[in-house]
A protein has these predicted regions:
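Low-complexity, small-hydrophobic/phenylalanine-enriched stretches
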Residues: 4, 9-37, 84, 131, ...
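Extracellular/surface-exposed low-complexity repeats and stalk/linker segments enriched in Gly/Pro
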Residues: 21-54, 68-74
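A detector of repeated loop/turn-to-beta-strand junctions in beta-rich toroidal repeat architectures
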Residues: 56, 81, 94-97, 109, ...
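Conserved short beta-strand element of beta-propeller blades
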Residues: 75-88, 115-137, 161-181, 205-229, ...
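A short beta-strand motif characteristic of beta-propeller blades
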Residues: 109-114, 154-160, 197-206, 250-258, ...
Length: 371
């Protein structure tokens, strides 16, 4: 460690120039500051640098090899939070279980409570404090449950979907949740998240293809919701459709996936500007591909990276910074308990995050606050 002792300063009419820089505790006294939608890479970040993420309205500081979010919460969106909630399963032993984990810190899931009835291959969305599960249950295929994300315990009945729906997908802007399905000509229904009650008809997914056979990938920002994955007859298609969440109407064409993917639940995760989609089955093969789109800009998806292994039946959610995919079914290793993650604004392959309580697939996932 260097020590500076100053007795006298002469020629103080100009600033002292430290040619090798001046650091305190390894951090430059004068830090760089960047405003951008993407994580800055040049100049190479050093300890103490600040980055204002204009896409998510989050302030970061570079510490210990990475940018860390500053403030009470890293969540900048009204529809998610730092606590992931994963519910249901295709296994009767745990098809009512809700489990949770902290998205900001890698680790394993713990028990949260139980759904009101068995469920699989439904979908979830919320408003940052409440998460609603649109269930596909053996006993009922149009029911919805809800939980308060910060309070461990069992789910309560919310109401019913406007139709009996199989293999749903849900989007949210923080006040309204819209749920769609391949059934009833691609019917969609919506609810106000902070109340309880039955869903109201929203419109239909506008496609001649079957939508989301065994689950669709959905994403959203504060205005738009996207639905991806379909079948054209018995073959995989690559369609993405979108809606304006506050405007009840049929969907419109958004673009296409980078590869055809259709059934057995590939899943999306979103922040305020970007939706990432991973897993699924296409042309008879399990996929490990991750695609991404800018949610507010129509066009085709771009390759993001790969999941840790090719999977179907995955579920996913995010905290507006980190996307997590949970469980899934591998064609040779069967159901998995793995949780894997990516940083939504940084393209690349997924990494291991932790484990679910048990191996499972065809679950539902959402997120909300932890306090």
């Amino acid at each position: 460690m260097s020590t500076i002792k100053v007795d006298t300063i002469r020629n103080y009419d100009s600033a002292v120039d430290f040619s090798q820089g001046f650091k305190v505790g390894g951090a430059d006294v004068i830090q760089n500051y960047t405003e951008s939608a993407d994580m800055p890479e040049t100049p190479t970040p050093v300890n103490g640098d600040y980055w204002w993420d204009t896409a998510n309205n989050v302030l970061y500081r570079y510490m210990d090899g990475g940018f860390r979010a500053l403030g009470i919460s890293s969540n900048a969106n009204a529809w998610n939070g730092v606590r992931a909630l994963v519910a249901g399963s295709n296994f009767s032993a745990n098809d009512t279980v809700i489990q949770y984990f902290d998205i900001t810190s890698a680790g394993n899931a713990a028990d949260f409570g139980d759904l009101t009835a068995d469920a699989k291959l439904g979908s979830a969305a919320g408003n940052g404090s409440r998460v609603i599960f649109a269930k596909i249950a053996i006993s009922s295929s149009n029911s919805m449950d809800y939980v308060t994300s910060s309070t461990l315990g069992n789910a309560q009945d919310f109401g019913d979907l406007n139709y009996s729906m199989d293999y749903t997908g849900s989007v949210s802007d923080g006040s309204r949740k819209v749920t769609g399905s391949k059934d009833n000509s691609g019917a969609m229904g919506y609810v106000a998240i902070d109340t309880t009650g039955n869903a109201t008809s929203f419109g239909n997914l506008s496609t001649s293809n079957w939508w989301g056979y065994n689950g669709m990938a959905c994403g959203n920002d504060g205005t738009y919701g996207t639905f991806a994955g379909s079948l054209n007859g018995s073959s995989a298609a690559n369609e993405i459709q979108y809606i304006t969440i506050q405007t009840a109407a049929n969907s419109s064409n958004f673009g296409g996936l980078s590869q055809t993917r259709d059934f057995y639940a590939f899943q999306s995760c979103s922040d305020a500007t970007r939706t990432v989609m991973g897993g699924g089955v296409g042309q008879g093969s399990h996929r490990n591909n991750i695609d991404y789109i800018t949610t507010a800009t129509t066009g085709n998806a771009t390759d993001f990276g790969d999941l840790t292994q090719a999977m179907r039946g995955v579920t996913g959610t995010s905290n507006a910074i980190t996307a997590v995919w949970c469980g899934g079914y591998h064609e040779t290793n069967y159901s998995q308990n793995v949780i894997q993650s990516v940083t939504i604004q940084t393209t690349g392959n997924a990494t291991d995050f932790g484990d679910l309580l048990t191996a499972a697939n065809e679950q539902m996932a959402g997120s909300g606050s932890a306090s």
